A protein has these predicted regions:
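Hydrophobic alpha-helical transmembrane segments
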Residues: 1-172, 185-309
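Pseudouridine synthase
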Residues: 175
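Substrate/ligand-engaging "lid" and interaction regions
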Residues: 178
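Glycine-rich phosphate/dinucleotide-binding loop and adjoining beta-alpha-beta core of small-molecule
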Residues: 182
């Protein structure tokens, strides 16, 4: 098999599998195992003194273990028939991409909201960390679209970025970074010490991908003038990264994101992204999905070119 074909096939196979299947509930997923490992460490170590140091130790060790284990497995496969390594990498890529599942979940939020506000609240609670019990219909739509933008970075662009930089071990290690942040990277009383290093590492790992995501979203619309809106409003977020893809989508849809939210019973007064507080519709969701898919295709092409050059 020509080397350039071998270089691009794992990504093509893994990406196409994600497009076709998403994350089937019947298929075991590494992120579930990551979550169990994080939960076990947090339960055992997030108590007493030195919580910040213990949290840093847990984050660094788990990330390093995932990288080392996947690197070692690839080394074991090198002397064997080449298709085995190709399949291994393709499966890792498939597991690390979450674009299709995210889009399905956001569509389900809008469908549920058409049935009732309560169903919409319950559905959006599956994909956001905030308290959804008292959200209005507009706030449910806003939360879903914010998550669609933010997780284009976390679930697609950032994994592909780290694939291009460090191969499948780096891609899988990034998923551990992201899972750590999603589970313990909160500024609540329980997690603010133990999870602070998980949050810092996630901020570093997503610094370039988040901004790249915003750029790709704007490129997907062909209206580069909106970049000024992104750079102005991307900083209006508690996260140093999440605001950029959210600002890109707010600029594309000419709407307003952000604002105060409840997380784990605590009110977080987040700034607004954008100024046009207009009614969001299913048409906006469909447009956002098209933007996500186009940005994803551009990124896949860039990584494919990187792999053969």
């Amino acid at each position: 098999m020509d080397s350039w074909i071998f270089a691009i096939l794992p990504l093509l196979i893994g990406w196409l599998l994600d497009l076709l299947l998403g994350d089937p509930i019947w298929l075991p997923h590494p992120v579930v195992w990551f979550g169990k490992a994080i939960a076990a460490c947090e339960h055992k170590l997030n108590r007493g003194n030195f919580r910040k140091a213990k949290g840093a130790f847990v984050a660094i060790v788990l990330i390093a273990l995932v990288f080392a284990l996947s690197w070692f497995l690839r080394r074991l496969l090198l002397p064997l028939p080449s298709y085995l390594l190709l399949l291994f990498d393709a499966i890792i890529i498939f597991y690390c991409l979450a674009g299709t599942t995210l889009i399905r979940e956001v569509r389900e939020v809008f469908l549920a909201l058409d049935r009732s506000l309560d169903e919409g609240r319950q559905q959006v609670a599956r994909i956001v960390g905030r308290d959804t019990s008292e959200l209005s219909a507009q706030e449910v739509r806003t939360a879903a679209l914010e998550t669609l933008a933010e997780n284009l970075s976390d679930g697609v662009i950032a994994p592909l970025f780290w694939l291009a930089i460090l191969g499948t071990p780096g891609m899988l290690a990034y998923k551990m970074v992201n899972t750590l942040d999603s589970m313990i990277g909160y500024k609540t009383e329980r997690y603010k010490a133990f999870g602070c290093w998980a949050a810092h590492i996630d901020d570093i790992a997503n610094y370039i991908p988040a901004r790249l995501t915003a750029l790709l979203m704007i490129l997907a619309t062909g209206k580069l003038g909106r970049l000024r809106f992104v750079w102005k409003n991307g900083r209006n977020h508690a996260s140093p990264n999440s605001g950029y893809p959210e600002a890109a989508l707010a600029g594309i849809l000419n709407c307003r994101f952000g604002g105060p939210h409840y997380y784990f019973g605590q009110l977080f007064d987040k700034p607004y992204i954008g100024e046009n507080d207009r009614l969001l519709t299913t048409a906006d969701m469909k447009k956002a999905v098209r933007v996500n898919r186009t940005a994803e295709v551009i990124m896949v092409i860039l990584v494919l070119l990187r792999s053969i050059l």
